[in-house]
UniProtKB/Swiss-Prot annotation:
Part of the 50S ribosomal subunit. This is Large ribosomal subunit protein uL15. InterPro entries: Ribosomal_uL15, Ribosomal_uL15/eL18, Ribosomal_uL15/eL18_sf, Ribosomal_uL15_bac-type. It comes from Wolbachia sp. subsp. Drosophila simulans (strain wRi). One of its GO terms (biological process) is translation.
Amino acid sequence: MNNAVKLNSIFTKLSKKKKPKLLGRGIGCGKGKTSGRGHKGQKARSGVSINGFEGGQQSIYTRLPKRGFKPIRRSIYSIINVGDIQRLMEAKKIVKDSVIDKERLYKLGFIKSIKDKIKLLNKGKLSEKFVFHVDFASEAAKKSVASVGGSVEILS
């Protein structure tokens, strides 16, 4: 049997795509004159929407009180758990007794920027010893690393 592709059997997404209705091309096209906007009024004009406008009702952002602030020099910490390091070792991406620092974590794709500070937390279990160079570590994480013979050095 002939398995050749016939031109009349080819269907593309382009042939199935319905073209949008053109607006404002005269009253004969069905969407002419007002182009589906109705007559007059604020929504009939160009540049229509006013963000946060609720029809004269006091808007939600003026009803709610102002709260808090954003500190200018906020420290951005990338959180690394000891369980994450264990999983990396099990996946053979790192070897035991190695140094875990910013450059290593950046190359592995664990942190987005080399400028981020690293915070070591104690989620999960660690079974091999590692040397950590981090900016912050919780007390529980320090104990967990020390219990398997590793060490944590705080950089800043």
